[in-house]
Design a protein with these regions (language model features):
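Long amphipathic N-terminal alpha/beta scaffold segment
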Residues: 8-11, 21-26
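A short glycine-rich, His/Asp/Glu-containing loop-to-beta-strand
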Residues: 23-62, 119-124
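C-terminal, beta-strand-rich globular interaction domains
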Residues: 99-100, 112-124
C-alpha cells in the first residue's frame, strides 16, 4: 500500500460516532471542540485526523502554522478560512489541501455552528 514503507503492521483504528478522543489544542474551549479520530504510532509518517466543531460566531481564533500538509473538508455550516493572504469561503462539501507552513486558520464563522474534518500529515524526521 501507499504508506507501507512508513509503518509496519499497524492495526486499523475504528471510532464509533461521538467516541473520538477529546483533545485540547490552541484555542480549545466550550465553543471549539476537537475530537481526535485516530493517529499513527511509530514510523516516519504522522497522520492526525480530527473532527472540529465550532459553536460560536464570536470566537477569537489563534493563528496556526506548523510543518506538514493539511486537508480540510467542511461537513456542516459556513466559515471563512485564511491561508497566507487568501481567504476561502467554505460551505458544506468544500475542501482545501495545503502546505501548513504558512499562517492559516478560521477567520470568521458565518453559521451558528460549523463542523469540519481536518487531517494533518507530518514527517516525524522533521
Amino acid at each position: 500500500s501507499l504508506f507501507k514503507q512508513h509503518d509496519k503492521d499497524v492495526e486499523p483504528t475504528f471510532i464509533k460516532s461521538g467516541d473520538g478522543l477529546t483533545i485540547e489544542r490552541a484555542g480549545s474551549d466550550e465553543s471549539r471542540h476537537y475530537q481526535l479520530l485516530g493517529h499513527t504510532v511509530g514510523g516516519s509518517l504522522n497522520v492526525e485526523p480530527c473532527l472540529i466543531t465550532i459553536t460560536s460566531r464570536d470566537y477569537e481564533f489563534p493563528e496556526f502554522q506548523h510543518k506538514g500538509v493539511e486537508f480540510i473538508y467542511m461537513l456542516k455550516g459556513q466559515m471563512d478560512y485564511y491561508y497566507g493572504t487568501k481567504i476561502y469561503h467554505f460551505k458544506k462539501g468544500d475542501s482545501l489541501y495545503f502546505d501548513s507552513d504558512k499562517p492559516h486558520g478560521p477567520k470568521k464563522i458565518i453559521s451558528d455552528e460549523c463542523q469540519f474534518l481536518t487531517i494533518i500529515c507530518t514527517n516525524n524526521s522533521d
